[in-house]
């Protein structure tokens, strides 16, 4: 990388205040800091020195997402060949490559639109470019069905970045999870592209790979089958491994668990939030099962849909989640409880994780405020009793 560092140093004077390309200084700074750690340190104020900066944090999150992404690519191919009845003649390699060719365009569109808007916004405002979309750009394709068209994805990403992030002040200032804003926009603006029985399995060929399925072919997710009153055709083993229809990166509990271990080991995600989401969801699902209000076991609610993915990667978002230790327990538990309640009580919307997290994003600051005020009150009482 020394040659690249030398090249950037050589052209850097062109972007200085007196340089001919000074108008694009923010773009150069953003590209430079993305590749290299800045060589400047603060000289005033109280500073905390840590080897983990925001860029490294986001890099670790992307690494944690890779198992879900790679398995999602394979599952896209698996579902296509399974629907065509061609599993016996298909190899792992052909299914994975086919899935990758279906998923990569969505990743490219997500990053090009999102980063393009962030670069343009930073240039317009004369601000430094942040790496905030590095994580959102890869999460967004993972939480949508493979049948979602690229044009709809581009519109949704643009809406989420501008309305859900930049108008709040940019990276670190948004109150809603950007990836979930994208999904919510798609769900409410283009519902037929995000739900139903025709969006979960790719139905065309790419470079001779895959199979063209009839226009009449439909395939529901397990939660969709439950909402329709039908029996679930997937086994618990398939639910855990992820060989079921669903959003690209949300089906494999094993792949998500690997990502969870990485996030917890690096200390990036809060174990309090993550644990309380699962506990809250499991308790309410068990109650519904005991009352005979749900046709599936309580543990199947945990492994189906976007519950695991949301609990690990989105409920723990450090920007939009609760930050106090006690508040994280309340925040996570309510998310898990709400997700299951929405699933069971609203048959028209079988997946409740998105709405549960977005709803609690609004209340995360209030939860932290109440926890802090409660601690202040306790300390004041101790002081007055001395």
Task: Give residue ranges: language-model regions.
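N-terminal signal-anchor module of multipass membrane proteins
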Residues: 1-107
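C-terminal ends of transmembrane helices
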Residues: 42-48, 114-125, 162-172, 258-266, ...
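Structural signature of hydrophobic alpha-helical transmembrane segments
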Residues: 96-110, 147-156, 239-253, 295-307
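Hydrophobic, membrane-inserted alpha-helices
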Residues: 113-118, 133-142, 157-164, 255-263, ...
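Membrane-interface helix-loop-helix junctions at boundaries between adjacent transmembrane segments
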Residues: 128-209
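Loop-to-transmembrane alpha-helix initiation sites
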Residues: 154, 175-180, 298-306, 328-330, ...
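Long hydrophobic alpha-helical segments that form multi-pass transmembrane helix bundles
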Residues: 172-257
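A beta-strand-loop signature enriched in Asp, Gly, Thr, and Trp
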Residues: 274-325
């Amino acid at each position: 990388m020394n040659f690249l560092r030398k090249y950037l140093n050589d052209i850097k004077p062109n972007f200085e205040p007196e340089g001919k390309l000074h108008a694009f200084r923010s773009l150069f700074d953003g590209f430079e800091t993305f590749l290299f750690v800045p060589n400047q340190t603060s000289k005033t104020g109280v500073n905390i020195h840590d080897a983990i900066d925001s860029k490294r944090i986001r890099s670790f999150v992307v690494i944690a997402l890779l198992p879900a992404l790679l398995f999602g690519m394979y599952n896209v191919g698996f579902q296509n060949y399974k629907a065509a009845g061609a599993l016996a003649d298909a190899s792992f390699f052909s299914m994975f490559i086919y899935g990758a060719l279906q998923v990569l365009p969505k990743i490219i569109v997500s990053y090009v639109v999102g980063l393009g808007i962030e670069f343009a916004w930073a240039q317009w405002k004369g601000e430094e470019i942040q790496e905030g979309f590095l994580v959102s750009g890869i999460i967004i394709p993972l939480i949508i069905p493979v049948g979602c068209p690229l044009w709809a994805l581009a519109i949704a990403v643009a809406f989420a970045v501008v309305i859900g992030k930049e108008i709040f002040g940019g990276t670190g200032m948004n109150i809603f999870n950007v990836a979930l804003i994208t999904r919510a926009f798609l769900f409410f603006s283009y519902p037929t592209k995000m739900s139903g029985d025709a969006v979960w399995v790719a139905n065309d060929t790419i470079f001779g790979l895959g199979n063209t399925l009839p226009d009449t072919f439909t395939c529901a997710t397990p939660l969709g089958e439950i909402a329709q009153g039908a029996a679930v055709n997937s086994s618990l083993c398939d639910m855990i491994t992820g060989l079921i229809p669903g959003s690209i990166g949300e089906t494999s509990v094993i792949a998500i668990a690997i990502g969870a271990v990485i996030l917890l080991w690096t200390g990036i995600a809060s174990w309090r939030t993550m644990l309380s989401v699962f506990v809250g969801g499991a308790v309410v699902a068990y109650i519904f099962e005991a009352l005979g209000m749900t046709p599936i076991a309580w543990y199947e609610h945990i492994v189906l849909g976007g519950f695991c993915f949301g609990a690990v990667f989105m409920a723990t978002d450090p920007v939009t989640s609760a930050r106090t230790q006690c508040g994280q327990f309340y925040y996570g538990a309510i998310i898990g409880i709400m997700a299951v309640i929405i699933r069971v009580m609203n048959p028209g919307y079988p997946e409740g994780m998105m709405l549960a997290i977005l709803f609690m994003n609004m209340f995360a600051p209030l939860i932290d405020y109440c926890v802090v005020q409660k601690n202040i009150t306790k300390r004041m009482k101790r002081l007055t009793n001395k």
